[in-house]
Swiss-Prot record:
Protein name (Swiss-Prot/TrEMBL): DNA polymerase IV
A GO MF label: damaged DNA binding
Native organism: Brucella suis biovar 1 (strain 1330)
Reaction catalysis annotation: DNA(n) + a 2'-deoxyribonucleoside 5'-triphosphate = DNA(n+1) + diphosphate
GO biological process: DNA-templated DNA replication; error-prone translesion synthesis; SOS response
Co-factor: note: Binds 2 magnesium ions per subunit.
Chain segments annotated as coiled-coil in the UniProt record: none
Lineage of the organism: Bacteria, Pseudomonadati, Pseudomonadota, Alphaproteobacteria, Hyphomicrobiales
Domain of life: Bacteria
Length: 445
């Protein structure tokens, strides 16, 4: 739990527009500027752990750069055979969602403007937001290109204001200087800070205090628990469990008996207990992506295309972050929830999808013994700057050719979208990898 050693303030409220502290608890508008955008909470001035998430990030950047799009439904994604990367909130009103097939999105919102993703531009804007976060605290843990956890413990003397005020200033600065909006969740732990940031999008600022955690979670769906994806939520539902409150009545031993080690984790989280610390990005240990399948899989023809798609996802993140990794890590979870991890160290760091995939495939082939898997993941660790990555292979000429081809594919995808070019591994299986249920968050809300 991250708390700031703050002396209790008599005020229990804050205006998000003029940043004045509110002395009355009943007024619906700011006593200084008249704004209705007030934050009130009993623990507002003692909480210091935040989750910051930019709103519909890709679409917001495109609307910023083209004011003519401001009042139009906008979809960022591939062609008719592609998927939605993100949609603005006007498009979401019509039912458009991230990862939706493009033809379905256009059926739902035929008047939508479609723009190909420009990952280079989004990465640049993401770095600007990240720098503003670092101006607040050195304890910034990036989660994706547009979101991060921040720990502002002990920063009140530096900023001459409690974390809630500092975060409200940050939100205004992002909006005024970068031209996009962000939603903020403030709490005492990472899990509930993340939950809070999703409560009032866009331009939200929500607070979940420690005293209210149990009651707040009680009537929420089990899918709100960190790490519970659609597949596990379906398992819980098959057991008659739909709300967190139902799980809160179970003893830790009963949860572990029913769900193994995941049961122990559930017991803590559904009580709002999360001891994870904010880890600054210079201490980032790995970059990974994983997928939980709708149905358990065992055949190579099903698993290999997924591995390829995930390898490309990890590669994109490494390239966007200008980092590389030397150790390839394969993660598998069997149908009975047993976890298998395998790793192999390379001779030099890589950020190439081809090298990640081929090394991961070698590890995967040793595990394909008929076992059915519910989850597959691939990642890299032992990270370093990308300037040391992937030197020319003087022995394997084909590897060098594949690296050149991958660079060309990257340029095409940056220009025309992620689905402009597909490899034989993913294309031949009818894009199986994209039909699975992702447990990582590659498409931002």
């Amino acid at each position: 739990m991250a708390e700031s050693p703050i002396v209790n303030h008599p005020e229990q409220g804050l205006c998000r527009d003029c940043l004045s502290l509110q002395k009355t608890q009943t007024s619906r508008r700011c006593h200084a500027c008249g704004s209705p955008r007030l934050i009130r909470h009993k623990e507002l001035y003692r909480l210091s752990l935040a989750h910051v998430d930019c709103d519909a990030f890709y679409a917001s950047v495109e609307k910023r750069d083209n004011p003519d799009l401001r009042d139009k439904p906008l979809i960022v994604g591939g062609g008719k055979r592609g998927v939605v990367s993100t949609a603005c909130y006007l498009a979401r009103i019509h039912g458009v969602r991230s990862a939706m097939p493009m033809f379905k999105a256009l059926e739902a919102c035929p008047d939508a403007v479609v723009i190909k993703p420009n990952m280079e531009k989004y990465a640049r804007v993401g770095r600007e937001v990240r720098q503003m976060m670092r101006d607040l605290t050195p304890l910034v843990e990036p989660i994706s290109i547009d979101e991060a956890f921040l720990d502002l413990s002990g920063t009140e003397r530096l900023h001459k204001a409690p974390p809630a005020v500092v975060l409200a200033r940050f939100s205004k600065r992002v909006e005024n200087e970068i031209g996009i909006t962000a939603s903020i969740g403030l709490s005492y732990c990472k899990y509930l800070a993340k939950v809070a940031s999703d409560l009032e999008k866009p331009r939200g600022f929500s607070v979940i205090g420690e005293a209210e955690a149990l009651d707040f979670l009680r009537d929420k769906p089990v899918g709100m628990i960190w790490g519970v994806g659609k597949a596990f939520a379906a398992k819980l539902e098959s057991d008659g469990i739909r709300t967190i409150g139902q799980l809160q009545t179970m003893e830790e031993g009963a949860l572990m008996k029913a769900y193994g080690t995941m049961g122990q984790r559930l017991y803590r989280l559904l009580r709002g207990q999360d001891s994870r610390k904010v880890e600054p990005d210079h201490d980032m240990k790995s970059v990974s992506a994983e997928t939980t399948f709708n149905t358990d899989l065992s055949a190579a023809g099903d698993l290999v295309p997924v591995l390829r798609a995930l390898s490309e996802k990890v590669s994109r993140r490494l390239k966007a972050g200008e980092i590389a990794g030397r150790t390839i890590v394969l993660k598998l979870k069997t149908q009975d929830f047993k976890l298998r991890t395998r790793n192999r160290q390379l001779g030099d760091p890589t950020q190439l999808a081809d090298r990640i995939f081929r090394t991961g495939l070698q590890l995967l082939e040793k595990e394909m013994d008929g076992t059915r898997f519910r989850l597959l993941g691939i990642g890299v660790s032992d990270l370093s700057p990308s300037d040391r990555a992937d030197p020319p292979d003087l022995v394997d000429i084909q590897a060098t050719k594949r690296a050149v081809a991958e660079s060309a594919i990257d340029r095409l995808r940056n220009k025309f979208g992620l689905n402009a070019v597909e490899t034989g591994y993913t294309f031949s299986k009818g894009n199986l990898a994209r039909t699975q249920t992702p447990t990582d968050r590659d498409n931002e809300p």
